[in-house]
């Protein structure tokens, strides 16, 4: 799959990445190479291969689930940029 400079420009704009015009063509070639490699991977027969999340099978250590009184609010909020009434104060993100 070939990617041209116009596609790179569009993707960069959608991703809010500022790329100078002189870098668009080299990026297009690089992305085309990556997609060609992915197309090669798609040709590999993976029938019968179990999905895996890691290359090494491990078991995570378990710990007792113990209820505590929680931390000291003063210590927890000591590094907070802003706190009020024992809560973190954060900017509003939902309008």
Curated annotation (Swiss-Prot):
> What SUPFAM superfamilies is this protein classified in?
Glu-tRNAGln amidotransferase C subunit
Question: Mind listing the GO molecular function terms for this protein?
Answer: asparaginyl-tRNA synthase (glutamine-hydrolyzing) activity; ATP binding; glutaminyl-tRNA synthase (glutamine-hydrolyzing) activity
Q: Does the keyword Ligase apply?
A: yes
GO annotation, biological process: glutaminyl-tRNAGln biosynthesis via transamidation; regulation of translational fidelity; translation
List its EC numbers: 6.3.5.-
Keyword Cytoplasm in record: no
This protein's UniProt keywords = ATP-binding, Ligase, Nucleotide-binding, Protein biosynthesis
Q: What class of enzyme is it?
A: ligase
Q: List the disulfide bonds.
A: none
Which InterPro entries does the record match to this protein? Answer: Asp/Glu-ADT_sf_sub_c, GatC
**Reaction catalysis annotation:** L-glutamyl-tRNA(Gln) + L-glutamine + ATP + H2O = L-glutaminyl-tRNA(Gln) + L-glutamate + ADP + phosphate + H(+); L-aspartyl-tRNA(Asn) + L-glutamine + ATP + H2O = L-asparaginyl-tRNA(Asn) + L-glutamate + ADP + phosphate + 2 H(+)
Protein family: Belongs to the GatC family.
Name the NCBIfam families on file: gatC
The annotated subunit structure for this chain is: Heterotrimer of A, B and C subunits.
State what this protein does.
Answer: Allows the formation of correctly charged Asn-tRNA(Asn) or Gln-tRNA(Gln) through the transamidation of misacylated Asp-tRNA(Asn) or Glu-tRNA(Gln) in organisms which lack either or both of asparaginyl-tRNA or glutaminyl-tRNA synthetases. The reaction takes place in the presence of glutamine and ATP through an activated phospho-Asp-tRNA(Asn) or phospho-Glu-tRNA(Gln).
Protein name according to UniProt: Aspartyl/glutamyl-tRNA(Asn/Gln) amidotransferase subunit C
Organism the protein comes from: Phenylobacterium zucineum (strain HLK1)
